[in-house]
A protein has these predicted regions:
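N-terminal secretory signal peptides that target proteins for export/translocation
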Residues: 1-3
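Sec-dependent N-terminal signal peptides
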Residues: 6-14
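Alpha-helical transmembrane segments and their juxtamembrane interfaces
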Residues: 14-15, 284
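Sec/Tat signal peptide C-region and signal peptidase I cleavage site
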Residues: 18-22
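Acidic, polar-rich low-complexity tracts and alpha-helical solenoid repeat scaffolds
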Residues: 23-323
Length: 323
């Protein structure tokens, strides 16, 4: 082939390639413009072409357009195609289930959700993707079921306590939410402060008016203490709440029980007594000091407790005489 003809052929293919690329870029720009404007009836025309060329890249956009334009049959078709291409992407079954829900076919909808949970690989990343797919559709019970399956497989590494707790919160089941956070603390005591922070955010926390506002937390903590007396972290958590709420009688009971269990020297009771005095709860302060005194003269706090008890008694008398 003469050089001149060869150059012409090369130029022809270069121009053709450039033209095709420019057309693709133009289609993509128009598709995204219409999509962002929520003009799905116009966007779907372009995504139809783009999806044929790069199905994985444009699937989500195309699927959304088909749902918004109520072309459920075509949406069903492309999802099934994607499932064949990506059999481990069980979140696609959730999208398929959504189509059946929109078509008022609850049996087929449920079938897809059940299949998704059955086939999901119970590893952290796969579990997250499927659970989030259910959560995006506000199918919280299914999302919880996914995490529970993941928990069975990863119970010693990452049991999904925080994710499940958040879902119970969204469902309005505060008791179940609280118990997930308490399970996290039981699983690993170092989770206390993270769980505490999440509970403060979820239950409401007012430092000026007694800390945690919801009585459910105290109730569930008391149950845990009875069930697991060896887990002192629950007693510490309850004491923290009682002190915040100025429930010093309750705090005295818990501190005394904890001191006995740990065969302590009364340090925690001495600290509570100071807190009681500063809040003018002299009767509870006297109980704290008396408990320490009862440990005997060999206790390092015996003499201090004796003096401080007299001081608390004096303050109580003078305060009641001169309110």
């Amino acid at each position: 082939m003469p050089m001149q003809k060869l150059i012409l052929v090369v130029l022809f293919f270069m121009n053709a390639f450039t033209s095709i690329k420019a057309q693709k870029n133009n289609d993509e720009q128009l598709a995204m413009q219409y999509y962002e404007r929520k003009e799905f009836d116009k966007a779907v025309v372009y995504f139809d072409k783009l999806y044929d060329k790069l199905p994985d890249a444009y699937f989500t956009y195309y699927y959304t357009c088909l749902i918004e334009t109520k072309d459920y049959n075509k949406a069903e078709k492309i999802i099934k195609k994607q499932i064949k291409r990506n059999p481990t992407a069980t979140n696609l079954y959730v999208k398929l289930g959504k189509i059946y829900r929109l078509q008022h076919n609850p049996d087929k909808e449920k079938e897809q959700y059940t299949k998704a949970i059955k086939e999901v690989i119970p590893e952290q990343n796969y579990v997250f993707v499927l659970a989030h797919a259910f959560e995006d559709e506000e199918l919280y019970d299914y999302a919880i079921e996914v995490y529970m399956k993941g928990r069975k497989n990863q119970k010693d590494t990452y049991p999904f306590y925080y994710e499940i707790a958040d879902l119970y919160k969204k469902k309005g089941d505060l008791k179940a939410m609280i118990n997930e956070y308490l399970d996290a603390i039981e699983f690993r005591e170092s989770e206390l402060y993270t769980a505490q922070a999440n509970l403060q955010q979820s239950l409401g926390y007012d430092d000026k008016n007694g800390g945690f506002n919801n009585p459910l937390l105290k109730q569930e903590l008391q149950k845990r203490i009875q069930q697991h007396p060896d887990k002192t972290v629950f007693s510490e958590f309850l004491i923290f709440i009682q002190n915040q709420q100025k429930d010093f009688e309750g705090s005295f009971v818990q501190n005394k029980a904890l001191d006995k269990r740990q065969k302590g020297d009364g340090t925690r009771l001495m600290e509570l007594a100071k807190l009681c005095v500063s809040n003018e709860k002299y009767d509870v302060a006297e109980k704290c000091y008396q408990y320490v005194i009862s440990k005997g003269k060999d206790n390092p706090y015996h003499d201090v407790a004796t003096i401080e008890k007299l001081n608390a008694n004096y303050l109580q008398l003078t305060t009641s005489v001169n309110p």
